[in-house]
Regions:
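Nucleotide-sugar-dependent glycosyltransferase catalytic domains
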Residues: 1-138, 145-156, 160-167, 181
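Glycine-enriched alpha-helix->loop->beta-strand junction motifs that scaffold or abut catalytic
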Residues: 10-11, 185, 223-224
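Generic beta-strand/beta-sheet core signal
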Residues: 15, 92-93, 111, 142, ...
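Short, hinge-like loop/turn segments at secondary-structure boundaries
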Residues: 30-33, 187-189, 225
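Short, glycine-/Ser/Thr-/acidic-enriched flexible segments
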Residues: 95-97, 115-116, 144-148, 176-177, ...
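Generic hydrophobic alpha-helical scaffold/packing signal
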Residues: 140, 144, 159, 170, ...
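Nucleotide-activated donor-binding/catalytic signature segment of Leloir-type glycosyltransferases, i.e.
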Residues: 166, 173-195, 201
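A donor-sugar binding/catalytic signature common to diverse glycosyltransferases
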Residues: 190-238
Length: 239
């Protein structure tokens, strides 16, 4: 988007949902458990941006040349200057989850988690309502858009954990598919169910660690367990 903004002279604001600006306090979001000190924390962002820019270069080089633009060198950091102005950065993260790093510049802002305040227009499946009303509050287990090489094996592990706990569960398979053992204390969601409607009715929330799901669980005030697959999810698990 920087290249498009540069070509057309359009001001741009950068938004982020997990840390992408180097600082002393936390390493890059994909490696939050490496506690190697301030030097590593800052260097991890340089390495991350170097890899991102290397991948971007494959398709941006031709596009920029076709549009009469120079190809910038790989420099291992974000582009803060564009069209003679400093690009503002807005983080959609609560300072209760990530205190603002002292080393961030004045152009970096933290707005808190973003939430659509449009009144929900949602009618739950009567079977879901009946399940929720039939006993104690269940635990939510969800996978979002995550998939693994063998979701049947993953769901076998989940089924074993559900049986061992004896808890009631609302399960959202997400995009993963896979087969789940037929358990009487489990309701499998079908179709779209808003987290902001569902989570307040849960006992706890167990999920993959997407930024949006994490925010929804925290807004609902529920105990949250993140079992990450990759990307920024280890960061949320570490918080």
């Amino acid at each position: 988007y920087y290249s498009v903004a540069e070509k057309y002279g359009i001001p741009v604001v950068q938004t982020q949902f997990f840390p992408m600006d180097k600082n002393d306090e936390t390493p890059i979001s994909s490696a939050p458990f490496l506690k190697l000190g301030k030097a590593w924390n800052r260097a991890s962002y340089h390495l991350g941006y170097w890899l991102i820019q290397l991948l971007e270069r494959r398709y941006l080089t031709d596009w920029r040349k076709q549009n009469g633009m120079t190809v910038p060198p790989i420099h291992g950091g974000p582009d803060y200057e564009l069209l003679g102005h400093t690009v503002p950065v807005i983080y959609a993260i609560s300072v209760q989850v990530l205190p603002r790093p002292n080393s961030w510049g004045a152009h970096i802002h933290m707005s808190g988690f973003w939430q659509d305040e449009t009144p929900l227009s949602y009618t739950p499946d009567p079977k879901l309502k009946a399940f929720l009303n039939a006993g104690e509050k269940p635990v939510y287990i969800g996978f979002g858009s995550m998939v693994s090489g063998n979701m049947d094996k993953t769901f076998a592990i989940v089924s074993k954990a559900i049986k061992a706990s004896g808890l009631r569960v609302v399960l959202d398979k997400g995009w993963g598919g896979g087969a789940l053992a037929n358990l009487p204390n489990v309701y499998v969601l079908e179709g779209f169910t808003p987290h902001d409607w569902l989570f307040p009715q849960m006992r706890a929330v167990v999920h993959h660690g997407g930024a949006g799901t994490t925010a929804a669980g925290l807004r609902a005030g529920k105990p949250t367990l993140v079992i990450p697959f990759g990307g920024d999810q280890p960061f949320w698990a570490s918080r």
